Amino acid sequence: IARVAEAVERILDGVPLADDSALLVLENSAGGGNGIGESLDELIDIHEAMAARGLDLSRVAYCLDSAHLWGAGVEIKGDDEVDRLVEQFDKKIGLEKLVMIHYNDSKAAHGSKLDRHQHIGGGEVGTRGLAALIRHPRLAHVNYYLETPGMEEGWDKLNIERSLQLSEGTLKLKPLPAEEPKVKKAKKVPAKPAAKTSSAKKPAVKKPVAKRSVAKKPAAKKKR
């Protein structure tokens, strides 16, 4: 925790404050079993460690990733669980410091420490938890970003539509279409042109017919 706070201090010291300065945004992790910042308690500890070092916290903000929360074992399955998360964040850090949510479902089991993003409503978090996140009245100021898979295959449009449906209170979404396995298309090898055949018939060659020689019989002599 102390090393993270020290690293943030060095970053801020190395970038002079200006009118167009960007925020340094810290995001929770799924954990992987040995990471820092996987739980809300650890984010709170980092925040307090930075404050203890006298850092300018107006230059620091936070992002929560729903798939990371789920993988780390944070409960976000419904309204009550999300209420508790929001209340704890506001009490210890302040909701004004939460500027973005990476909005993803998860293929991983709850508390698995795995980071496996999934299409909206197609994973383990489910529509109730995701709807609770995007509809929460105290998170209206937050920007939501999709990090779902299949960007190059055109899935973004579908995930945006499903997110909007959840934001409007529609929990029953249509089943996701089957994902086609990525198969590399074989390069087409141009076919060799077929040998041209001449349709003109060769002139028939008549073989000479052998002439037969017919020997004439000698004329019979008349008897006197």
For the regions a language model picked out, list residue spans one by one:
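Histidine-acidic metal/acid-base catalytic patches
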Residues: 44-224
